[in-house]
Amino acid sequence: MNNSSMKSFLSKYHLQLFFFAVALESLAANFAHPITPTLIQNLQLPDYSFGMLYAGMAFTNFLFSPFWAKQVTRMGSNRVLGICCVGYGIGQLLFAIMKTLPTIMLARLLSGFFVGGIMVSFLTYIIHTSTMENRGRYLALSATFTTVFAAFGYLIGGFAGVVSIPLTFALQSGVLILCGMLFAICLREDREVTGRSVSIWKEANPFQAFLDARRFMTLTFAVLFFAVFLTSTATTAYDQNFNYFIKDQFHFNSSYNGMLKAVVGFISLIANTTICVWIMKRTNVKKSVIYVLGGAGVTLIAITMLEDILPFILINIIFFALNAIYIPLLQDLCASASSAEHSSMVMGFYNAMKSLGMIAGALFAGFINAAGPRLSFLYAGIFFLVSMLAAIWYYRRSGRNRENA
């Protein structure tokens, strides 16, 4: 295949190659998750280390997401993904090598810095290279691939960790670096062509990147981002408590964890490729998201009242489906509300609010669990209901704006 044929092939199949690389990255990103508790125990680190390291990675993800959104505009999603996947791979190698809590925290902070760029670029590439008609479907597909292959990555990491923890980290880093090469080579150019010469280091101040959000921020956007923050907080608090709860309350052994991850992945696949796509094509997303968020809140509150295993699992399955659906719906709302000029910054801010919710949810679950094992579910349900109220306000505000236009 000559150079011209290769370029033609990459141009024609860039989205298929993008989703293949997304699946591979989501797979590799989760190899280390099931072995992290074992690594912490082997190093005799304090019990709070797991939550602290998770929050550390989420913190730099949050802090630098708007920064990476600006770099997407300058360099293009393909280059940012290439840089960030390689950087993430190096961060995970350092995670495996370090032996003390402070040095491991530095490795996690480094990984979080690059993960922010990956998450932002996933969204910006879809927005920049798809039509308005296909954007919602592709966002749902991206969310599906991320969730489903994360579950399989968790399973693979668990099995590989039994053989060797260093081998698992080496495998993870190798696949992440491979993903970086695929993204850099196979994706279409989507950077903004400008005559300005801008230094990346001059823009490296993450707080300036947040201040630059004033270019697009309105009260309507602020309420939408508040809903993103609340839902991310709720989902993270739920996730952090769920595995501990089923082991503590129902005495499930550790083998059920991988099985449940696989079930979650399968449910997400079905929900996103059927219900979510139907909502985006056939309904008003601004209105439909209200019912999805409300349903998620009600199911979580119902979970706190269930004592038997079977009803508990069934209601959780309903929540898994709703939890899978709301993410691409909120992504689509943020993308639809942004102009072409500010789309990268908007999605960067979206990822920042999602990451901030991850930090808040992890810390909240850690503290509230001591007061009661079901309280994380209860408050996560309340957070979803409050986000539903924010979605109602957003829907009504949008309706008034159309009438006044």
What are the functions of these language-model segments?
Residues 2-12, 190-224:
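Juxtamembrane intracellular "pre-TM" segments in multi-pass secondary transporters
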Residues 9-58, 223, 232-249, 257-260:
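Helix-loop boundary and gating motifs at the non-cytosolic
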Residues 58-66, 150-151, 265-273, 358-359:
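Residue-level signature of mid-helix packing/kink "hotspots" within the transmembrane helices
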Residues 64-76, 161, 271-284, 369:
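Helix-to-loop junctions at the C-terminal end of transmembrane segments
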Residues 79-94, 287-302:
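Structural signature of the two symmetry-related core transmembrane helices
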Residues 91, 102-110, 310-318:
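Paired small-residue
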Residues 107-148:
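Cytoplasmic helix-loop-helix junction between adjacent transmembrane helices
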Residues 340-371:
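A late C-terminal transmembrane helix in Major Facilitator Superfamily
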